[in-house]
Amino acid sequence: MNSTFNQTDSGIFSNRTEENLLCCNFSSVVTDNGFAAAAPDERSLFIMRIVQIAVMCVLSLTVVFGIFFLGCNLLIKSEGMINFLVTDRRPSKEVEAVIVGAY
């Protein structure tokens, strides 16, 4: 019974990291002109960064215009409320007479 659980016997759970690492030499890819080729991850990271910048610009403009139009709407409503509360004042005839008389 002890022979089935022998520590030297790897069984199903064998440690194959050494065998997996031997197949790759981790050298860079070299093109025809001798320079190392750029990793495709760099290009995708660059594109992702550009997309992030574009999305942030669009969101920023949306927020700025939203605040602007909300402020304009509140300003229009407040002017309407002020005009509703203020009674119309008409200049008296005396004021017109004074203005005409001054010229």
UniProtKB/Swiss-Prot annotation:
Membrane-spanning parts: 50-70
A GO CC term attached to the entry: membrane
Subcellular location(s) per record: Cytoplasm; Membrane
Keywords associated with the record: Cytoplasm, Membrane, Transmembrane, Transmembrane helix
The keyword Transmembrane is annotated on this UniProt entry: yes
Membrane topology: Single-pass membrane protein
Family, as annotated: Belongs to the reprimo family.
Protein name in the entry: Protein reprimo A
